[in-house]
Design a protein with these regions (language model features):
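Junction motif at the cytosolic side of a transmembrane helix
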Residues: 101, 193, 241-263
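Transmembrane helix boundary and interhelical loop/hinge segments in multi-pass membrane proteins
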Residues: 17, 94-113
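Aromatic- and glycine-rich beta-strand/loop motifs that create alpha-glucan
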Residues: 1-31, 262
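Hydrophobic alpha-helical transmembrane segments of multi-pass membrane transport/permease proteins
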Residues: 19-52, 81-95, 207-218, 240-245
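Membrane-interfacial helix-loop-helix connectors in multipass membrane proteins
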Residues: 48-60, 68, 73, 145-173, ...
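Selective transmembrane-helix segments that form parts of the transport pathway or gating/packing helices
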Residues: 89, 119-148
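Extracellular/periplasmic helix-loop-helix junctions in multi-pass membrane proteins
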Residues: 193-201, 216-236
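A structural motif at transmembrane helix-loop-helix junctions in multipass membrane proteins
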Residues: 18-25, 160-208
Length: 263
């Protein structure tokens, strides 16, 4: 593994991304949408009085926050429950960058010079994966910080402290980057076998299904957030899947076959 080759790939991919403003906007916009929905609900609750019937419907959920007022507890449940969807951002957004990275280069015939170099396939994969994952990670972190500050400003400072809890700080620093890398690797692997970006994104999009399942299950179970143990287990599982994806990608990303098709 030669860091110089990996850095060269990262630099090239970063330049291509910065030159594509539409793709760059696609990194930030979904994250803002996911954050805006619960924030709008919180703002609505803040300016309206809760109906007693509504309180009865959500009583089982707000019991998790016995030290908060009823209104703030309802807002806290909404805000914390929707945070599971922050894991969708690193699962979905990098896929668009990764598929464009391979399929766009195959179409523009700029992938061929990279494959013709003495660079190892693993070095190319890691370089493209890191370059595609970093923007999504930074976007997720940025929107997460904004999410905490804005909701705290709408309600009370206590809300910001609830959002920036230990579990979600660990999840942001470990699980989000790992999910990004896994999503990117799967996108690159799929893109190496097909020639249409939409097809690659649809196939690779299956990675978001388990995340959606976790988010929905958490909502209906009444649990507003994950435990630290669940996050750490998720880290181990995703890290193992990344290792498997690298092995499979090194095997599937057939340099000679791609060069033959491009030729």
């Amino acid at each position: 593994m030669r860091p110089g080759y990996i850095w060269a790939v990262i630099t090239k991919e970063a330049q291509d991304l910065l030159a594509n403003r539409l793709l760059l906007a696609a990194v930030v916009f979904p994250a803002l949408v996911f954050a805006a929905i619960p924030t709008a609900i919180v703002a609505f609750i803040e300016v309206n009085e809760l109906d007693p019937d509504q309180i009865g419907q959500i009583e089982q959920y707000i019991r998790q926050f016995p030290d908060l007022s009823v209104k703030l507890a309802a807002q806290a449940f909404i805000v914390l429950n929707f945070m599971a969807y922050f894991l969708l951002i690193p699962a979905m957004v990098p896929m668009a960058i990764a598929t464009q990275s391979v399929i766009g280069e195959k179409t523009a015939r700029s992938l061929e010079p990279q494959l013709a170099t003495p660079m190892e396939v693993s070095e190319l994969l890691i370089g493209k994966a890191v370059a595609s994952a970093v923007p999504a990670v930074l976007a997720t972190w940025g929107v997460f910080v904004l999410y905490g500050l804005v909701n705290g400003a709408i309600t009370q400072p206590e809300m910001t402290r609830l959002i920036f809890n230990d579990v979600w700080r660990v999840a942001m620093l470990t699980l989000v980057p790992l999910i990004c890398l896994l999503s990117v690797l799967l996108g690159i692997i799929v893109s190496s076998r097909v020639n249409d970006a939409r097809t690659a994104q649809q196939i690779g999009g299956f990675i978001v299904l388990p995340v959606i399942g976790v988010a929905v299950a958490g909502f209906f179970s009444g649990q507003a957030t994950f435990s630290l143990e669940q996050v750490l287990i998720g880290d181990l599982v995703v890290a193992a899947l990344i290792g498997v994806s690298l092995v499979i990608g090194n095997w599937i990303f057939d340099r000679e076959a791609i060069l033959t098709r491009l030729g």
